[in-house]
Amino acid sequence: MNNTTRAAIATAAIGALLIPLAGCGNTIASSGKTELTVWSWDASIDRAAKNFMKANPDITVKVSNVGSTEETYTALNNAAQAGNGLPDVTLIEYLAIPQFVHSDTLMDLSKVYDTAKLKDTFTPGTWSSVNINGGVYAMPADSGPMAYFYNKDVFDQAGVSEPPTTWDEFYEDAKKIRATGSYITSDSGDAGLFNAMMWAMGGHAYKLNDDKLTINITKDKGAQRFMNLWQKMRDEDLIDVHTKTWTDDWMKSLGDGSIASLISGAWMANNLLQGVPQATGKFRVALLPTVDGTPINGEYGGSGLAITKKIPDGKLDAAKKFVEYVTTNDEGIDARVSNGSFPATTKTLNQKDFLAKTTLRNADGSDNEFFGGQKYNEVFSQAAKDVTGKWEFLPFEPYARSIYNDNMGPFFSGKETFKAAADKWQKALKLYAEDQGFIIQ
């Protein structure tokens, strides 16, 4: 597949939304300093950049927020198509990296770093996510190992003394919790959760080898395990399929215990603190249940820092320094972790102070024992170690997720089985892939 075709894939996958790209020219500052442009939707990158500039006064870093993740990818695509306006460095979710690799937008960092030595710096799940077809296209900046967040008060009231360790236990606990009037969890149609659960249940539904693409959702063992469980639980009214994720109603239900637990990435901790402060002290965290008790996990979210391929040679050293600072330097990592990001480095995950934390940080900077004094990072750290690296995202993952509910909606509304809905989604993905020039295996 040539670069023109690959660029077209990104265009079709993101859409035609145009976003003005101000201040993104490849210039050297008039002061003689090297000037880097960085795109990030996460404010903690800006904080890290300010610390970086103090230590590197010869480099100016201009961080721009061009919008949401989707808007960032649209802007990247528009700039790549136009041939100008790309940032030098960009934050990018792991799920979107394959798409921009195949549009020839990102630099292979194995050509500018000794990535063989960096491999053990990062967790298995994040390192796997930045490795595409033998190249390394971003440095892991944060991660989202899946964990189980549960309302201990509701569990106690239902007679569930410990969080489930297997999915069979999860199902049995769900019946006890439903008897109290609450649901054990909710899902009204979340493509991110679907993929993360496939990953955590040992699945590997997608495989790309150059232009040859395998999409095998309906026969994938991880997908089958998840769909069988969710089908049974939906049929028995054991999961809330009506409350939309991230809405005020969802937060209210988490706060009052109507939804007793959720499956999410470790980054969810601070979102709970901000979204349901009334539940302070009630929630705990546990490792995600598994099929048979054997440790295995997946990632739900996370992002890396990538250098764009057309960066001027005179800026490359500065970009390398900045990316390395944010992703591997203790000070750079702390600037993000202290503001809610979950680390991707094994060193941070094993630090005594990190593991001993029992508080989250309120917006005013004060400490909050949201998890009732639990050393929650001990759980998250182990969750990160349990992630299997055997996972690949589609080379048009943002598009795939954008049509998930169009195809899966009938399952959540009770009109179709999960497998029937998944089969429709799979067929739509294969048709789209063929339209973009991939050879379906």
Residue ranges of predicted features:
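A structural signal for short loop-to-beta-strand junctions that line the ligand-binding cleft
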Residues: 78, 86-88, 118-154, 183-184, ...
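Glycine-centered hinge/linker elements that transmit conformational signals in sensory
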Residues: 174, 212-244, 288
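C-terminal lobe and pocket-closing loops
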Residues: 268-279, 292-299, 303-402, 440-441
